[in-house]
Amino acid sequence: MENFQKVEKIGEGTYGVVYKAKNKLTGEVVALKKIRLDTETEGVPSTAIREISLLKELNHPNIVKLLDVIHTENKLYLVFEFLHQDLKKFMDASAVTGIPLPLIKSYLFQLLQGLAFCHSHRVLHRDLKPQNLLINAEGSIKLADFGLARAFGVPVRTYTHEVVTLWYRAPEILLGCKYYSTAVDIWSLGCIFAEMVTRRALFPGDSEIDQLFRIFRTLGTPDEVVWPGVTSMPDYKPSFPKWARQDFSKVVPPLDEDGRSLLSQMLHYDPNKRISAKAALAHPFFQDVTKPVPHLRL
């Protein structure tokens, strides 16, 4: 750790404080994540160390690079490449004018490329949200915190007792499914896609049941026809209200037909029928994709 000079605290992640820091030897600016684990007393579990070490092999232009893992006594520091801003802050700053559609399309395309790469290596994210999608001034967007959920679990609250958001959580997780797939990340990205377009969260639930009911009110309450097996999921209740599906043109009015088609496939109830990242990249919505540069206020 003595090789790093902390410059400033840049945030509080799910697992601990994040600092902007400088490598004293190379001058490289990095993001330093201090992982606070519940097992402070026993030190860091070896399983977590193994999981995290595997992530150093994930090299892709749309994945935030894990540069190093520093394990001291009972603390764990992860050294990542540094990016200037997250998508949440960028969306907040663009709330009045909105994000131009070509930039939304570029961001979604890049994020799907990053997802397709990780999914092909059997790595899930499980906790995608605008706060862990990082952008730079060149128009790139990258997925951060990939694989951390498997190494450390997804807590209900962060180390500062903030509630971990449910807004982007797939319905199969909310319904208690223990064995989920890469499809959970596609769902999260679909929610983020809609949020970039409409400038508001698609399903801003404040509890697990509120989250489910917001999804049901928009997409209709799922049944065995649209989602075989749903009624036998651990947290499914026959007493759930039966809502009808809303017309997608009213849910995301600014989107054209191709955009609505892609979004509806990303938000398919049945995880087995939900579009894969690889298939989504070939969707007609992306036939005119470019890479515009964002107007960042850094």
Curated annotation (Swiss-Prot):
Site (CDK7 binding): K9, K88, K89, L166
PROSITE patterns cross-referenced by the UniProt entry: PROTEIN_KINASE_ATP (PS00107), PROTEIN_KINASE_DOM (PS50011), PROTEIN_KINASE_ST (PS00108)
Regulation: Phosphorylation at Thr-14 or Tyr-15 inactivates the enzyme, while phosphorylation at Thr-160 activates it. Stimulated by MYC. Inactivated by CDKN1A (p21).
Modified residues (Phosphotyrosine): Y15, Y19
Gene3D superfamilies in alphabetical order: Phosphorylase Kinase, domain 1, Transferase(Phosphotransferase) domain 1
PTM annotation, UniProt: Phosphorylated at Thr-160 by CDK7 in a CAK complex. Phosphorylation at Thr-160 promotes kinase activity, whereas phosphorylation at Tyr-15 by WEE1 reduces slightly kinase activity. Phosphorylated on Thr-14 and Tyr-15 during S and G2 phases before being dephosphorylated by CDC25A.
InterPro entries named among the record's database cross-references: CDK, Kinase-like_dom_sf, Prot_kinase_dom, Protein_kinase_ATP_BS, Ser/Thr_kinase_AS
Modified residues (Phosphothreonine): T14, T160
Domain Protein kinase intervals: 4-286
Molecular function terms, GO-annotated: ATP binding; cyclin binding; cyclin-dependent protein kinase activity; cyclin-dependent protein serine/threonine kinase activity; metal ion binding; protein serine kinase activity
A GO CC term attached to the entry: centrosome
Function, in words: Serine/threonine-protein kinase involved in the control of the cell cycle; essential for meiosis, but dispensable for mitosis. Phosphorylates CABLES1, CTNNB1, CDK2AP2, ERCC6, NBN, USP37, p53/TP53, NPM1, CDK7, RB1, BRCA2, MYC, NPAT, EZH2. Triggers duplication of centrosomes and DNA.
The protein's assembly and partners: Found in a complex with CABLES1, CCNA1 and CCNE1. Interacts with CABLES1. Interacts with UHRF2. Part of a complex consisting of UHRF2, CDK2 and CCNE1. Interacts with the Speedy/Ringo proteins SPDYA and SPDYC. Interaction with SPDYA promotes kinase activation via a conformation change that alleviates obstruction of the substrate-binding cleft by the T-loop. Found in a complex with both SPDYA and CDKN1B/KIP1. Binds to RB1 and CDK7.
Protein name as it appears in the record: Cyclin-dependent kinase 2
Species of the source: Cricetulus griseus
Gene: CDK2
